[in-house]
Amino acid sequence: MEHQELFKKHSDFIWDIANLLRGPYRPPQYRRVMIPLTVLRRLDCVLEASKDKVLAEYKLCKMSSKFNDETIESIICRKFDLNFYNTSEFTFKTLLADPNNLARNLVNYLAGFSSKARTILDKFNFGIEIEKLEDANRLFEVIKAVAAIDLHPGRVPNMAMGYIFEDLVRRFNEQANEEAGDHFTPREVIKLMVNLLFNGQEDVYTEGKVIRIYDPTCGTGGMLSESEKHILAENPRAHVELYGQEYNPESFAICGSDLMIKGENTHQIVFGDTLGTGRGKEGVVDGDGHPDETFHYMLANPPFGVEWKPEQDYVTQEHNKLGFNGRFGAGLPRINDGALLFLQHMLSKRVPSEDEGGQPGGGSRIAVVFNGSPLFTGDAGSGESNIRRWIIENDWLEAVVGLPDQLFYNTGISTYIWIVSNRKSDKRKGKVQLINAGDFAWKMKKSLGDKRKKLGEGETENGGFEPNHIDALTRIHGDFQHDQRLRIADIQTNIEPDRKKKRDQEKSVLVSKLFDNRDFGYLKITVERPLRLNFAVTEARIEQVKEGSFFTNLAISKKRKDLVGSAAEIAEGKAQQAEILAILEGLKPRFDAGELVRNRDEFEKLLKAAFKGSEIGWSAPLKKALLAKGALGEQDSEADICLDAKGNPEPDADLRDTENVSLPADIPLPLPLAFENNANKGKVDKSDLLELTRQHCQDYLAREVLPYRADAWIDFDKTKVGYEIPFNRHFYEYEAPRPLAEIEAEIKSLESEIMAMLSEVV
């Protein structure tokens, strides 16, 4: 409670200082100044006691030619037990002593930080803001106000300072929601993710336990900080190590600063593109910033629906060369949404479970928030489907929580939390829990960008009340019940879909369902029907022959550089065209009465006899061109079936259809089917799979297709495996439409209201 009062007091004070920026800055831009200054003031207070001694030691080391800058930094940090230091002559107080040179001195003060601190602080690009404040004649006023805040660690402990900073980051980001939404996850969503991640995990209570947490898209570090707080609240003696990677400079600076001002290690937060581009440069990590590292817990909010074209070549190369020895073995999603690449990346960093050859109690848990696309986008055999298949068949998908819409600052779409783990509890093995949290929403008093709803968090900071949706959803996850229902009154929501009609509080909604892993898999079978054609030689069909590629290509020369040879080839082709047309014209009278030949073999004999002895002859290409559908042949359901050389029916591509058939109820997972990749050139042996599923598919055909299309058959060579999670379909419940009398009465009521309003105008 003492920490909470302290952080509220200081946070409000800093928030009020931001009003000094009004004019040169718009409110959404205040964070550009106030967040870096808060960090600098905390660092200034932390270094105050050792400042003089550090300066003396630094000067002494610089006088020696034996030490380079890296060695000097190591000596000073070790000697004074510091993670960073500052070698400038200035502090916040002494900066104010020279108002005329404040801007220049502040820049020198920033340059005086040791390299590890500068790596973070430089990403704020604060020099631009110093110049802007100086030009607006606000710099002295702002620095004076910030210098008056006492953030000394003796009076503001690290934990309280963490609360202050996180609160400021949240408030400034909410104020700048239009700009910050891409990399700022709402606090209550993070809390729910953390709760679900650690729900039922006994290892977090082990004294002295080393727990490694990772976020590959860590943004401002909210998920890492919330995870650490959750663990330390339950187990103060736990040893938590935080790892992250971020490519937005300001977000990286905020995340690193959060750790720095709490006295924690910052070198495990790296700056760079997690997926990788293959175009690395100094100071930027290109690709995996923590190679060969594994983590116990991982969280992420990858960008929604953002294309990964800049990373395409690098990622595709890794997929093709390394397969499952790299990060992206299961497949690549379509270029317009790379979210599933991040999940594959996280799974590559899992701690092996005991079943995977790891230590007893090993394994990892992942919480990641996606939009709806990763649930179902991608047909059978596509990259997205194969990634889902890989995860589900390995029994790693534990739960999916469908959140309310309008929770995020920069999008109103519905979002979903995936819980993925290679150490499921015994009761969850082979199962996936879907949780419908769509009604667990609390309407906000004031919208923040697209965010109009939030998850209720219980008692609020200002003493108000919200239902505790986070705890309720955590319990639903822990209860692990099938077909669990709750009354609207028990959910406690103030969202009314219909403004004129209150929700029935006694109505129950489905909130939890359990599924077997195989329930999400299906076989995409290709259903063929035979090619049936009638044939005739008529003017219209001859015109179709003339428009065909075989006929037109006869008069096109391939000898482009040999003009003489080209002309001769074209002339020869035109002669062949004329000969074909002449022969067909000779056959026309036979069909003047509308006669049709409904057997292809019979018609072929007729044509073969007509072309016998001609210059062009009866070649295979000519045969194919003339007998094709859309040439002399036309589709006819009454015609005989066209057979191939082996006597098998030929399929009609225009009648081809596909059916998605659920997997057999008793089929073991994983399926005996390799993933298509560069090594097997997309060709995989399906024989074992077909042996297990052939009769199941034939039974489906007999039940669902043959009663309507008796000549249909399955082309098993085209069979593909798909996986999808049709979340909304599983929670859809039919509601009968309102009685017509009720609708009519409402229309009449609205008409009366409109007439009353019009009468007031007139």
Regions found by a protein language model. Give the residues of each.
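Non-catalytic, mostly N-terminal accessory regions of nucleic-acid modification and defense proteins
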Residues: 1-201, 270, 274-277, 402-405, ...
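Conserved Class I SAM-dependent methyltransferase catalytic core
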Residues: 20, 26-42, 329-420, 747
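Short, contiguous acidic/charged loop-to-helix segments that flank catalytic cores in large enzymes
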Residues: 24, 309-318, 323-337, 373-383, ...
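Short acidic (Asp/Glu) and glycine-rich catalytic loops that position anionic groups and cofactors
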Residues: 143-144, 173, 265-276, 320-326, ...
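Conserved S-adenosyl-L-methionine
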Residues: 183-300, 304-317, 340, 371-373, ...
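Feature representing long, continuous alpha-helical segments
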Residues: 225, 253, 300-302, 340-348, ...
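Flexible, glycine-/basic-rich loop-and-beta segments that form/coincide
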Residues: 409-539
